[in-house]
């Protein structure tokens, strides 16, 4: 088994506490509301929403994937860090055992946020993950993030 790590970073004008509430803590409700074409629904299969919780994410029509199952590995509300593993679903091919993600929000000097994301692809055997495959997924995640940011800018009294 190999592990391939990819890191990305982008910025937002939204401060970390507000962004964490919307983009992380309430994503299961907010994203299907503002982007049903991307995520149809999210449901807890097991757990209470905290560490160890298993969630099924069903994607919208037109998505290349039907659904995935996430396991929450960590939530640090004080330091705005969230980690989870994608453990099941059609996004995991016969080459990937699991994908672990960590998202950390830090305050930027202008009052907004710097979003740091790390993805660890745990492969089966000696398979290598192509960077363009990862970039396509990151672009979709970045698009969802921009939708959340736009929603927060348009609704300044939500997630305060």
From Swiss-Prot:
UniProt cross-references to InterPro entries, sorted A to Z: Bet_v_I/MLP (IPR000916), Bet_v_I_allergen (IPR024949), Plant_def-hormone_signal (IPR050279), START-like_dom_sf (IPR023393)
Pfam families the record matches: Bet_v_1
Enzyme Commission designation: 3.1.27.-
Coiled-coil portions: none
CDD domains linked: Bet_v1-like
Leading EC class: hydrolase
This protein's UniProt keywords: Allergen, Hydrolase, Nuclease, Pathogenesis-related protein, Phosphoprotein, Plant defense
GO BP terms, alphabetized: abscisic acid-activated signaling pathway; defense response
Keyword Nuclease: yes
UniProt GO MF annotations: abscisic acid binding; nuclease activity; protein phosphatase inhibitor activity; signaling receptor activity
Keyword Disulfide bond set for record: no
PTM comment, free text: Phosphorylated in vivo. Phosphorylation prevents its activity as ribonuclease.
GO terms under cellular component: cytoplasm; nucleus
Task performed by this protein: Possesses ribonuclease activity in vitro.
Family stated for the protein in its record: Belongs to the BetVI family.
Designated name of the protein: Major strawberry allergen Fra a 1.05
Organism: Fragaria ananassa (Strawberry)
């Amino acid at each position: 088994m190999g592990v391939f790590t990819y890191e990305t970073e982008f910025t937002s004008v939204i401060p970390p506490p507000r962004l964490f509430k919307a983009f992380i803590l309430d994503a299961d409700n907010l994203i299907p509301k503002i982007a049903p074409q991307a995520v149809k629904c999210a449901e807890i299969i097991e757990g209470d929403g905290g560490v160890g919780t298993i969630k099924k994410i069903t994607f919208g029509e037109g998505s290349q994937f039907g659904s995935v199952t996430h396991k929450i590995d960590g939530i640090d509300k004080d330091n705005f860090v969230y980690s989870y593993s994608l453990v099941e679903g059609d996004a995991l091919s016969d080459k990937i055992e699991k994908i672990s993600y960590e998202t950390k929000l830090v305050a930027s000097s202008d009052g907004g946020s710097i979003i740091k994301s790390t993805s660890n692809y745990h492969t089966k055997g000696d398979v290598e993950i192509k960077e363009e495959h990862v970039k396509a997924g990151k672009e979709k995640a970045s698009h969802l993030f921009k939708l959340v940011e736009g929603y927060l800018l348009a609704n300044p009294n939500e997630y305060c």
